[in-house]
Amino acid sequence: MTLDLSKPATAGYLSGFANEFATEALPGALPHGRNSPQRAPYGLYAEQLSGTAFTAPRGHNRRSWLYRIRPAAVHRPFEPYAGAQRLVSEFGDSADVPPTPPNQLRWDPLPMPVEPTDFVDGLVTMAGNGSAAAMNGCAIHLYAANRSMQDRFFYSADGELLIVPQQGRLFIATEFGRLDVEPFEIAVIPRGVRFAVALPDGDARGYICENFGALLRLPDLGPIGSNGLANPRDFLTPQAAYEDREGAFELIAKLNGRLWRADIGHSPLDVVAWHGNYAPYKYDLRLFNTIGSISFDHPDPSIFLVLQAQSDTPGVDTIDFVIFPPRWLAAEDTFRPPWFHRNVASEFMGLVHGAYDAKAEGFVPGGASLHNCMSGHRPDADTFEKASVSDTTKPHKVDATMAFMFETRTLIRPTRYALDTAQLQADYFECWQGIKKHFNPEQR
């Protein structure tokens, strides 16, 4: 199977999360019984791509063997990229990262560009924490683009990219094969994997969480049991597909938050076969098996956890990816929307579709909000008043929605861009100012 981004993919996918996959685009391209034969089939080169340390425990060890037309080392030297440099990877105090305010923050959607702009040039960092160089924390980017990548390819050496499209499909051609991703789906591109993005719908906008630390994994289910939340079989990895093209191409690398470019005389998407457990994947959020209360109270949002990146502290993650999908609410004598909250963790939210059930106005698809450690948040005044008098003897379906959250153990620091942009809603705090005083010590 060869790569062709001009039309939808026809190849199927490999099912399962972090499975040991094996796939070949030409029969017999995978060596039999060994990884690095003296001569690989079809004159290919054997190359290992390691996503974890060689000595990581077997259950956490992630690597793949690629059989490609040319090794990844074949390109000209990198030089600083002359295009937009709007990415940040170090979140200590700097010109790019001013002091973090304790205010609740909310943004309108990133505008679509006027000039032709592809996926790489459409990236901008909104917030993050930790350090790409130290391999801990994350960066949260937005993208807005209106042109497919043309004869250029991209990879991030800083972290794995969790991509959440909000508008427009993405045809993502990678070294491992192709992912077609639409809104309501996510894609994860591992650290170091080279790829190109085509925009079949013209305009595209979305969110990215770049994970600098331990790889994303499925959470343990505990008392939920052996099934529920995001089921492993619904994660899809591409089958091998390649292109054998020569010409004047550009390879763009992201390292320590900076973009670099190199000339390359061939397409780096030339992997004819591969096997291993370190590969891109996608997941349809509409397949999430939502858990909730059928008696009383609103459980903690951890019941909506899709993926997590673990820290060195048991039970505390560096990143939690949480969604708020369509679901039934059945709890009686209960305030059904998400409750008022202050959190030791920090929460960056986005909205793919519809409305979020804790906010009646102002939080729109493509927009974002940030509630940092111990900043009070959740229902606005209108939502509280309506939910306080609603009939809870009948189930209610929250429909036509898809919100999500990147939650982190450490402070999420907005960038200078995020604090200065015209999309920042200066009046966000007003949504709570109409909350009334109902207290009456004479009436219980």
Curated annotation (Swiss-Prot):
State a single Gene Ontology molecular function.
Answer: iron ion binding
Any idea of its EC number? 1.13.11.5
Q: Name one Pfam family in it.
A: HgmA_C
Q: Where does Fe cation bind?
A: H341, E347, H377
Cellular component GO terms held in the UniProt record: cytoplasm
Cofactors per UniProt?
Fe cation
According to its UniProt entry, what is the function of this protein? Involved in the catabolism of homogentisate (2,5-dihydroxyphenylacetate or 2,5-OH-PhAc), a central intermediate in the degradation of phenylalanine and tyrosine. Catalyzes the oxidative ring cleavage of the aromatic ring of homogentisate to yield maleylacetoacetate.
- What protein family does this chain belong to? Belongs to the homogentisate dioxygenase family.
Q: What is this protein called?
A: Homogentisate 1,2-dioxygenase
